[in-house]
Swiss-Prot record:
Transmembrane segments: none annotated. Keywords: ATP-binding, Hydrolase, Iron, Iron-sulfur, Metal-binding, Nucleotide-binding. This is Iron-sulfur cluster carrier protein. GO terms for biological process: iron-sulfur cluster assembly. It comes from Haemophilus influenzae (strain ATCC 51907 / DSM 11121 / KW20 / Rd). Binds and transfers iron-sulfur (Fe-S) clusters to target apoproteins. Can hydrolyze ATP. Gene3D superfamilies: P-loop containing nucleotide triphosphate hydrolases.
Length: 370
């Protein structure tokens, strides 16, 4: 659909506006914003220019960079003194692995996986979900780590219990704006889950499909660690749009991450990339950065297996303290270095999902966010 321009903008001014926005470059863009058809309306009223953008991925940070980069040129081109931006999101529904049917109320599912435990997969899942929300999307999180459900505690919601409006479906818990569900909400915090693989897989499938997800753009699933039968079964049963594999710089973790990539390839789930967690230790006293687990492993693995390094996240005591307190870093201190790293990760995950995927036009819904 062509961009609407108000009649008081000359043809030359209209062309200049499009050229200025078209020339904006960003690391997450594989096509320019005009080719993407994101510029919907440009209106001039007095000395004020109103610009409406509509984006198919969660991109608040990118939109802010766009505003800073092009505003002066746009004001000059249109003889205006003020720009009012309106950014809306029409998050694309993308093709699911193996053409599986959608989960009701969910556009896209992002599986966060690790080849082994202890690499910080759950902490990445929680902060990624919150960062996607901060980037403009409606987001939920499902704790599929059936034997060690930690998401309720990390979200500060361990004492909450879900309700059922009809004795058949579950209303998700709301925490920090996220819609969340976990087997941990249904049992005591100190109880052990002693289930065989098929029972665990069946329970998680129920949890996914019987939760009343509220028109989510993205559902982040915190997968169980490892690459065994449960993980393989879940990867086959869940209509995943794309997967993120979490690792650390240690050689043994990288070897297990390769197994995770291979597992998703085996079941035809696109791997968006790897997240190298604990990439750098940041001293809480002096801010010194030290690569205590080594360097370069993620880049070498990414090159060898043709995947992207989506982020290299720090090891910092604040991440652990904030999650223990149920107030994740991304919401507690959104402007600090750690939160910004997660926001960049969310931006890359959302855009990479879009570029790798195929849009399902009939399932796109419109949502005004600001």
């Amino acid at each position: 659909m062509a961009t609407y321009f108000s009649d008081n903008l000359t043809a030359d001014q209209q062309n200049q506006v499009q050229q200025i926005i078209q020339q904006f470059q960003h690391p997450t863009l594989q096509k320019d914003l005009i080719v993407l058809n994101t510029l919907k309306k440009v209106e001039k009223g007095g000395d004020t220019l109103r610009i409406e953008l509509q984006l198919p991925f969660a991109w608040n940070s990118g939109a802010e960079q766009l505003k800073q980069a092009v505003s002066d040129a746009l004001l000059k081109a249109t003889d205006c003194k003020l720009i009012k931006w309106a950014v809306a999101y029409q998050i694309a529904t993308l093709k699911r692995a193996n053409n599986q049917p959608a989960v009701k109320g969910v556009k896209n599912i992002i599986a966060v996986s690790s080849g082994k435990g202890g690499v910080g997969k759950s902490s990445v899942s929680v902060n990624l979900a919150l960062a996607l929300q901060a980037q403009g999307a409606r987001v939920g999180i499902l704790d599929a780590d059936i034997y060690g459900p930690s998401i309720p505690h990390m979200l500060g919601a361990a004492d909450q219990r879900p309700t059922s409006p009809d004795n058949q479906h579950i209303t998700p818990i709301k925490a920090h704006g996220l819609s969340a569900n976990s087997i941990g909400f249904l049992m005591n915090e100190d109880s052990a889950t002693i289930w065989r693989g098929p029972m665990a897989s069946s329970a998680l499938s129920q949890l996914l499909n019987e939760t009343l997800w509220d028109s989510l753009d993205y559902l982040v699933i915190d997968m169980p660690p490892g690459t065994g039968d449960i993980q393989l079964t879940l990867s086959q049963q869940i209509p995943v749009t794309g997967a993120v594999v979490v690792t650390t710089p240690q050689d043994i973790a990288l070897l297990d991450a390769v197994k995770g990539i291979s597992m998703f390839e085996r079941v035809s789930v696109p791997v968006l990339g790897i997240v190298e967690n604990m990439s750098m230790h940041i001293c809480s006293e002096c801010g010194h950065h030290e690569a205590i687990f080594g360097t370069g492993g993620a880049e070498k693995m990414a090159e060898k297996y043709n995947v992207k390094v989506l982020a290299q996240l720090p090891l910092h005591i604040r991440i652990r303290e904030d999650l223990d307190a149920g107030n994740p870093t991304v919401v507690r201190v959104p402007e600090n270095e750690i939160s910004q790293a997660f926001l960049q990760l969310a931006e890359k995950v959302s855009t990479e999902l879009y570029w790798q995927g195929s849009v399902i036009p009939s399932e796109i819904l419109f949502k005004e966010v600001k």
